[in-house]
Amino acid sequence: MRITTKATLIGLLTSLMAGCDPQPAPPIASHIYINGNIITLDDSHGTVRALAIAEGKILAVGSEDDILEHRGERTRLINLEGKTLLPGFVDAHSHLSGVAIQAISANLLPAPDGPVNNIAALQQTLRDHIASSPVVAEHGVVIGFNYDDSQLEELRHPTRHDLDAVSAEIPIVALHQSGHLGAYNTRALELSGIGPDTPNPAGGIIERESDGKTPSGVLQENAHFSAIYPLIPNFTAAQYTQALKAGIAIYAANGFTTVQDGKTDPKTLNTFAALSSLGIFDLDVVAYADLAVGNQDPLLRGPLLSPSYRDRFRIGGVKLTLDGSPQGKTAWFTQPYLQPPSGQADSYAGYPAFTEAETTKWITLAYQNDWQLLVHTNGDAAIDQFLNVATTVAETYPDDDRRTVMIHGQFLRQDQMAKIAALNIFPALFPMHTFYWGDWHRDSVAGLERAENISPTGWMIEQGIKFSIHSDAPVTFPSSMRILHSAVNRTTRSGAVLGKQHQLTALHALKAMTIWPAFQHFEDQTKGSLVAGKLADLVILDKNPLTEDGMDLLSIRVLETIKEGRTIYIAPE
């Protein structure tokens, strides 16, 4: 008994002595942020007061006392002074290559983003651009971005005659804000080989003058896509690098640390691959190749098609476009447009980009190759086609975690939600439409009932479906605060609320700009929330979106954007 007692005492003393061993020092941070509202967007942490980073990753989050234990002699201590820090925004869908070209093109946007609210202003903006643009001087082509017929006083598209009045010698293309139409002057039509005898291509329309033959200058969908790409200037590497850097700077100024290029054409895809190796990307760029055009590109079968970035670039998969835009009245509906476009019958409901057989071919190709697939669908008929084909193809190529993405889903019907859930489709929605085209959708495109349910984020919350929200830049500017404001308020240009049942809380909207699009991209283990081990991708705002009045969200400023611990944007004083 004594032996046992003695042994027990020795064991106890040994345990106590072991407990006195010095604990290892906590790891040292390179940066510590204190005295701020640090919104982690991680449910287990919520909002904290301090964050430490080391080697480009988050070391710890928590109270100031706990985090300051990671302070060393060389640690940089940043006092947020009550400002707000949250994860860098993850772009759910846009077109970096388009933003790059937009940055060096004529700005044809209407107010509040540009000067063009009538045809005369459009013409003058193009004249000014011709006079000042080195791109026009060198390449002899004029590209203007993002006129919006719904906001022009004339409520029509510019014609070839309107653009010929600017110049009959230089080819001019005015791109519609939807990205799905373009207005061409006569010279641009000639260079594109489009004349009175040119038939409409499959999935596209050449609008005609009153004689029914002569092109008016307005090209829709595939007619536009086939004409525009050959007219884009053949930039030198230095020129395109400059444009690309300008585009990246716009995203960084809006707090984005990951950017998408959706439906990347083969030339641009190869250019991105080449330029990334030169280290020009300050943030992560994930490209999705044009499935219908670039499916034979060797890059889709090479090491860049990867969940990991190389020189801040990777190929995430492919994109397929099944219809057009509702604001341009080319989206494919099951019910007619409220007011059909000029020259169309009252029964006009838009049109598909592909037949069901063609769509089946493309989706099968993506699933066969295990390519993550983004599918552009705006009208409910296009969504029907997508869901029906995806259901059939998934029976042959099942995958529980494919994360096929529905891009826009603007006029998704509630009865389609069951298939969205059953197929594990990830919806990437576009609630900025409520501001830019909400009045137009209600009064001209679809009527009140359909318009109130555009980008139906409320249905997603009700059914517990993760989703993301985006800008579709250059369709709209990649304004993070406009994305947030539109998702929370759903106010139109006229100030009306469109679809109150789909208004998001600021917290849900922020998740749809960070952790949920990170999940969409298969990157939620490294991005989208502020937890230890994830990349130190951060944005600092001057005010807290969780406590600001919803209508004031647009006034919040991005002060600093940080990619893996390195500042890539800081707001001017």
How would you name each of these model-derived features?
Residues 21-35, 39, 43-301, 307, ...:
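Divalent metal-binding segments
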Residues 364-374, 381-404, 408-409, 414, ...:
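His/Asp/Glu-enriched, well-ordered alpha-helical/loop segment
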Residues 564-566, 572:
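Beta-rich accessory regions
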